[in-house]
Amino acid sequence: MVQCKPPQEFSFGPRALKDALISCDLALKQMYTSAFSPSERLFLSEAYNPNRTLFSTLLIHSAYDWLLSRPEAPEDFETFHASLQLRKQSLARKHIYLQPIDLSEGLAGCPLLDHLRSCAEAFFLGLRVKCLPSVAAASINCCSRPSRDTDGLQLHTDGILSFLKNNKPGDALCVLGLTLADLYPHDAWTFTFGRFLPGHEVGVCSFARFSGEFLQAGSSVPDSALLEAAAAGGPETLPRERGRTLCFSALGMVQCCKVTCHELCHLLGLGSCRWLRCLLQGALSLDEVLRRPLDLCPICLRKLHHLLGFRLLERYKRLHAWTRVMVEIWSGQEAGEPSVSEDTLPFSADSGMGCESDTEPVTSPSEPVTPDGWSHPFPDGPEPVSEDGLGSLMASEVSLTLGGPVDAMEEYGQWLTACIQTLEREGAEEELLQVDAAVDALSRWEMFTGQLPVTKQHVPCGKDNVGLRRVLGDKFSSLRRRLSSRRFAKASSSHCRWGAEN
């Protein structure tokens, strides 16, 4: 992969970021002022403050980053607010359901579901997160195939999404399937981290790629005949991998929490983020996944706040409490089991999607695929949207070595502490006025949205161009007469031929 050394900043500028957060619409501006206190608005102004300290500008690390591979107009709050009018989602339902698939407490060597549930309840403050009883993949009408880079099987996402849609609880705001099995959305893709079905608020995500080198199988190589039958698509022939366990390091657990919250945000209606470093960025390589932060940028945070109505300070305090618990748990485990992890999460050999056709070589897993690219029919509903399938074709096999994940969690806790201190700061209104005045004094940057400006019909001309206009007018009149006479001559000749034939 071609790397940018050092990484290059990608920014829309303070004025564009402010418009994305607050909007240029008067009603949405008034909504923003009434929804947030001065201290909250000062905190959110970090989105467009040139001297921001809490949120980071996007960085381009390679020529194949998701941001460059899928250039699209980013979703600002005004666009998000307008899209809600088209959704039938009822926010009176306050339950998020997690549907484990071949996954139960203790299977992964730690209370994985408990960690995910507590993280999601802090992240989506005001919603209750429930775990449904685990279902066997063999009981789902789901196609499968042998994995290209492991000894296990990969499950096709469409069958799982159909199952979740047909078995969605009546009080569910959304349902997210969780599996330790690898997933694939199309035959041409090597794998995907997740996929959701727009309009039905159901999705599925896989944690298989976050186990690193800790995949252990009691029976690692199933019978070849069963593999061939399973690859043919028969759910009855899907072999059960007995004794299969996944052991997660602290790094892997954090990635599981990030992917879960990422998918749930999409199920609630938030689009991918292209403004600042944010959990809702897409990813085309594993290092992009690992670089994503565990929280939202201010623009996406306003979208989530609009849906759930929490207080920002309370949410960050809940996340801080969850982080402290996680640090205590993993600090004890690392002290007792130093050999469990060297905090190295290896890339797969293909680093994601394998392209075996002549279509677009790199496609975003976090956006709807184009009809002529990776389109794939889905019965009785809209096309599912893939999330974070790794799609860089130029990636080679590399190993990403990070610092201690517990240290990273402690840094995240320190960042949350800084957010809490900003939200508790007094005299925020005066400081906010200074920031707004400095940003409003900057020149506005017009964003290209993919539509060319409307051609002006009347171009004002000066009086000194009267002669030129007369000459051009005479010329066009002459051409018009010639064309008219030519059409009349052709019409006459064709009429004569038609009469002669009769």
UniProtKB/Swiss-Prot annotation:
This is Archaemetzincin-1. The active site is at E263. Belongs to the peptidase M54 family. Binds 2 Zn(2+) ions per subunit. One is catalytic, whereas the other seems to have a structural role. Its cofactor is Zn(2+). GO terms for biological process: proteolysis. Probable zinc metalloprotease. One of its GO terms (molecular function) is metal ion binding. Residues 336-383 are annotated as: Disordered. Zn(2+) 2 binds at C273, C278, C297, C300. It comes from Mus musculus (Mouse). It comes from the Eukaryota. Zn(2+) 1 binds at H262, H266. InterPro entries: Archaemetzincin, MetalloPept_cat_dom_sf, Pept_M54_archaemetzincn. Its EC number is 3.4.-.-. Keywords: Hydrolase, Metal-binding, Metalloprotease, Protease, Zinc.
